[in-house]
């Protein structure tokens, strides 16, 4: 489909250094922020580091990439990110926003389940699709008990499971419990609306503080929300077939 995006950037950095994994994780975050100073035109992040300290640091970093209203008002640009990671820790507790984890057994970490999961569903972006019930290629079913599966669900960690003789990833959620498609959809709306608003400002000699000017701005807002409706991010009214949203 024309909407499928398959752009990948590979950034090589020196191995993180430090006295322990905590310091090395901080060094990795510093390296990522250094990269952003010259190239911030990307959205989703994967790394080859799977240790607990790395995963926790990357999740916290991703959550912090979304600027606050005050920061936006002060002129900070919005280059929010989303982190996909994998873990072999059944007890890992991460509740950050803007990140998603998938569990894999220690001996299968080299299968890179996070990359397989993102590669399986990510190309549909920005179209809204359910991240549950997906079947990434090339990853092994984890050898875990029903109690451990329940614990992973409670912790909002995704995992490959088998139910009714069907294998699929459960539950398609971020670490804070939000569905992945909802978070990605909200980010897309923010990004597309910014593009539309900048187009209005750049293509018009002046956007007056009048009804005509408000109409130009409103046009950008409605164009964004209608686009999100077409992509399935916003639901349609079954009777009118219009997107279910309101602009105040």
What are these regions (language model features)?
Residues 1-248:
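Surface-exposed assembly/interface segments
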């Amino acid at each position: 489909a024309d909407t499928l995006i398959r752009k990948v950037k590979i950034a090589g950095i020196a191995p993180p250094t430090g006295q322990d994994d905590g310091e090395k994780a901080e060094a990795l975050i510093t390296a990522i922020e250094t990269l952003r100073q010259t190239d911030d035109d990307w959205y989703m992040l994967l790394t080859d580091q799977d240790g607990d300290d790395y995963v926790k640091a990357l999740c916290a970093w991703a959550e912090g990439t979304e600027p606050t209203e005050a920061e936006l008002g002060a002129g900070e640009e919005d280059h929010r990110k989303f982190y996909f990671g994998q873990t072999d820790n059944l007890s890992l507790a991460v509740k950050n926003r803007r990140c998603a984890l998938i569990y894999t057994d220690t001996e299968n970490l080299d299968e890179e389940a996070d990359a397989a999961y993102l590669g399986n569903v990510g190309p549909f972006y920005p179209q809204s699709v359910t991240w549950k019930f997906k079947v990434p290629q090339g990853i092994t079913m984890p050898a875990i008990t029903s109690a451990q599966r329940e614990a992973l669900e409670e912790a909002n960690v995704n995992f490959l499971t088998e139910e009714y003789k069907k294998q699929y990833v459960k539950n398609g959620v971020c670490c804070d419990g939000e569905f992945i498609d909802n978070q990605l959809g909200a980010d897309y709306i923010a990004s597309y609306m910014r593009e539309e608003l900048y187009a209005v400002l750049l293509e018009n000699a002046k956007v007056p503080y009048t009804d005509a000017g408000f109409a130009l701005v409103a046009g950008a807002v409605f164009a964004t929300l209608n686009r999100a409706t077409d992509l399935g991010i916003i639901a349609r009214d079954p009777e009118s077939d219009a997107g279910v949203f309101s602009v105040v």
